[in-house]
């Protein structure tokens, strides 16, 4: 694997990943962190395009067979710090029915016939991808020299799980190719992937709790708006049927429709109320999504901002007014008191 060559590390956070995807040019896609592997959580977020798993990397022997599917986009990891962005790309570039944007679409076409190592090199050389990735750099005024005897930090790694052409794949840029986990349908692929993810979680949880799982999904606001349109149509159909019954032009017999839809006034009014509640719930969810996106935006601004000059100026101002030393002494006294309490 090459050195990082100007690639920063980025935080494993759904707000960061969502903004990164948008800045690359992909439309109506977001990332959500998963706290459980329950099917109810999957159902809430569907459609799920792929899963991204972060864990502390340790070298391991691999005896699984590499898939020979040449249609799948698979790139070897060449730049260490690019692994998060590469895991995201592994999902996006293997997904159908999403708008990649002109530049990423051209990139996908350009590298389509490249071998995995060259695909990885192409990712590292893409100005669009690199600049977008590095837009999340946290400015640091301090430069630390790399000492030879300095203990290396833990290496964390991202892998992806995706459905592709009727099968579930695990994509790990440190491996020679994709691993096929089994056959699937668009509706059950998460059920196929879950046991493999659980196995990894159980393995790492024995001595390592620092891992997380995120889902790449269609934009929730767009999905909810589509749901509301469907509910509005259903409500309109029910109201038309109710109007027909009230005017006497419609039958009041369930047998006429084979019991497929409510045909009594009571049942129709009940169903209209149910649909109204569903619409209200969806609208409330949209408001929560909008609030979440505002929070993500604010958090990302704070992540990128260097607060060190502000802190230094505050300290300087306290020192000029002779208020710094009393605060330092107060802090020392508090630490001393806590140490005495623990003895």
From Swiss-Prot:
GO MF annotation list: cysteine-type deubiquitinase activity
Subcellular location(s) of the protein: Cytoplasm; Nucleus
Family matches, as InterPro entries: Papain-like_cys_pep_sf, Peptidase_C12_UCH, Peptidase_C12_UCH_sf, Ubiquitinyl_hydrolase_UCH37, UCH_C
Alphabetical keyword list: Cytoplasm, Hydrolase, Nucleus, Protease, Proteasome, Thiol protease, Ubl conjugation pathway
GO cellular component terms listed in the entry, alphabetical order: cytoplasm; nucleus; proteasome complex
Main location as per UniProt: cytoplasm
The EC number(s) this enzyme carries: 3.4.19.12
Leader peptide range in chain numbering: none
GO biological process, one term: ubiquitin-dependent protein catabolic process
Residues marked Important for enzyme activity (site): 172
Site description Transition state stabilizer, residues in chain: 77
Domain UCH catalytic: 6-218
Catalytic activity reported: Thiol-dependent hydrolysis of ester, thioester, amide, peptide and isopeptide bonds formed by the C-terminal Gly of ubiquitin (a 76-residue protein attached to proteins as an intracellular targeting signal)
Catalytic EC class: hydrolase
Region (Disordered): 242-266
Residue ranges annotated for the ULD domain, each copy included: 306-334
Family of this protein: Belongs to the peptidase C12 family.
Subunit (UniProt): Component of the 19S (PA700) regulatory complex of the 26S proteasome.
Record function comment: Protease that specifically cleaves 'Lys-48'-linked polyubiquitin chains. Deubiquitinating enzyme associated with the 19S regulatory subunit of the 26S proteasome.
Annotated protein name in UniProt: Ubiquitin carboxyl-terminal hydrolase isozyme L5
Source organism of this protein record: Dictyostelium discoideum (Social amoeba)
